[in-house]
């Protein structure tokens, strides 16, 4: 699993697989789920990610347990200014 954040667009992306994306499904205005050709979740895109501190219900997302663990793990990582 890989976690990336684009500060310019305020987008968090959690990669569960390196398989190419076959289709994307917009869950709501903040979440997009990407699937590979087999229908397996490849990743989850969180738009306006910094607004998540106000509370975000991810319970309806596929693999929400994995997403929760990834975000918790990311909070433990040191951040260095360039």
Where are these regions (language model features)?
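Small, basic N-terminal interaction modules of short regulatory proteins
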Residues: 1-82
């Amino acid at each position: 699993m890989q976690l990336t954040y684009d500060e310019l667009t305020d987008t968090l992306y959690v990669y569960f697989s390196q398989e190419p994306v076959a289709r994307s499904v917009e869950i709501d205005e903040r979440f997009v789920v990407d699937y590979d050709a087999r229908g397996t979740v490849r990743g989850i895109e969180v738009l306006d990610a910094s607004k998540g501190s106000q509370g975000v219900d991810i319970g309806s997302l596929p693999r929400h347990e994995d997403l929760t663990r990834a975000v918790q793990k990311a909070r433990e990582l040191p951040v260095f200014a360039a």
